[in-house]
Amino acid sequence: MKNKFILPLVVLGSSVFGQFTVSGQLENYANKSVLVKIYENSDLKLIKNTKTDAQGNFSANVPKEYNGFVRIDLPTGENLSLLTDNKNLKFKTVAGQDIMNRLEIIEGNTQKEYNKIIAMQPLNEVQNQVFPYLMQMYKPTDEFYQAMIKEQNRINVLNKDAKYSGLVEYIKTLNDLKQAAQSGKDTQAVDKIVTHFVNDDDRLEQSGLFNDLVFAYVNTKLSTGQGDNVEEKLIAATDEILAKTDITTPRGQNILSTLLNIVPKDQYAGFHKKYVDKVNGLTCKITDQLKKRVGQATSMQIGSQVPNITFDKPINGKKSLYDIKANQKLIVFWASWCPACQQEIPYIKEFYKDFKAKGGEIVAISLDFDETAFKDATKDLPWYNYTDLLRWDSPIAEQFSVSSTPTLFLVDKDNKIIKEVHHISELEAAKK
């Protein structure tokens, strides 16, 4: 990766050294949890788990230089992505379905500018997706056809006249490129994506579009490459992009980390083995993100020992997963907000009766966010129940490579994995 900027540098000042603040007010959202995240090495990273005050106010400090999207996550599933050029962000909105519609930016010129692009998106979608379809149904001489041409010209003028600052223009360029690659209209889209991967600074990782561009790149390569073997085409596309970005650089490692995440391991085991082995053979510095990807690929296998889970407070006198002694343990990852989990709970309860009688124990790890919801959901569950109230940001879920709920790990008395399943019926069937 070439270490150069394609955008003008921010004028030097105190903000260059980070330490800017994200603050907001959420109406109808008093004394509730808020997760503040930024993109680091293309992945979302939690920087603060905080609570609103009685008026719905909260604030969080971003402790480093950052030019990209800050994401605000609420336990109900809503989120906001706000663009910053390393300067303070302040906003006001209402929690719930209108979180975007009622958004008011009080401080943050970059997001105010980006709102103009958001406002143009419906018009551009009509122009690019609706009009081409409708025009096939009319003659060029028809009045409605002429009206569509007139509207297309108006939209083109609006887009042409719009002027944006460096960071906003950059984000727009990346988003347009992603859409062009997905639509297949731009035959040079892949080459343009590669150019960004090779030349851009870390604003590419902070754009929130990095993973989308990696996916667009590999998907296009799969659809245009020679041969029918998907795994071979995946490997060829990966080798090609790593040769251009260099696997010893953070950029090359970020690309590989993304690919290891999006390519299903159960379908393409050869792909994963090749690149896990390649990473294990590197002598250069490896990003924490790639270390985790490779570590997860090798640690959660049948026969391997699961990580210990230390509880914030003792549960029934036990301080950790390892403290719970049993012939076998069933570690259940679930959540009160997960419909599939709620359907599974009655079957787990029934399974527990015989399992407990034979010296087994269940430890349920809930990926919840709201403490009240967790307590209500677990008050009648007879096993060990724990949550760190971080939902998918839970380091426990990351350590266990859990990407969906419910996920169940059956382990022996030494905490070594016997089986991983997603439904209790799979364990019942294995007994027959």
Language-model-detected regions and their locations in the chain:
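Bacterial Sec-dependent N-terminal signal peptides
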Residues: 1-25, 432
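A non-transmembrane, solvent-exposed segment enriched in polar/low-complexity residues
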Residues: 19-200
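Helix-turn-helix repeat elements of alpha-solenoid scaffolds
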Residues: 146-151, 228-236, 267-271
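Charged, long alpha-helical assembly modules
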Residues: 174-251
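N-proximal helix/coil linker or "cap" segments that precede and/or mark the start of modular domains
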Residues: 260-312, 322, 372, 376
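Short active-site neighborhood of thiol/selenol oxidoreductases, capturing the structured segment around
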Residues: 319-348, 361-363
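Structural microenvironment flanking redox-active thiols in thiol-disulfide oxidoreductases
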Residues: 343-379, 392-398
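Thiol/disulfide oxidoreductase modules built on the thioredoxin-like
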Residues: 392-432
